[in-house]
Amino acid sequence: MKSVLCRNLGCIAIIAVLFSGCSSEKKLSQISGKVSFKGKPVPAGYVTFTPDVGKGTNGQVVGFQIKDGNYDSIRNTPPGIAPGSYKLSIAGFDGVVIPFFGQGKQIFNPINNECVVPEGVSTKDIEVPNSAGENVKIEKTADT
């Protein structure tokens, strides 16, 4: 009887060890920051993080809403972003809601940037270059 109990406990221990490292969930990092254009906070918009596969980052594209010049990964579901290298796309709007333009009028052409998201908590502030505001092309959005 004692040997059967020991054998069963041994099997349970081995199974527990085998499955302890099998979680497919990666630990998510937190990132936040300010987005400004011509020295002022961008009223509305979004920052899109696309994994840079060429630099070894895999995963989903993640977008964060800009509100009053700030974005924060904690507002998303799940809250956070996997650590790694990303290509960024930033779009900004004036925040004045009008028909066909849910976030308002576009205030600069979308810009691209790069970012490395470290493990843990980090900040990435973005200053949109003034040149992005020249010859603004109105891009259709999901709201149009």
Where are these regions (language model features)?
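Glycine/proline-rich low-complexity segments that form flexible loops, beta-turns, and polyproline
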Residues: 2-144
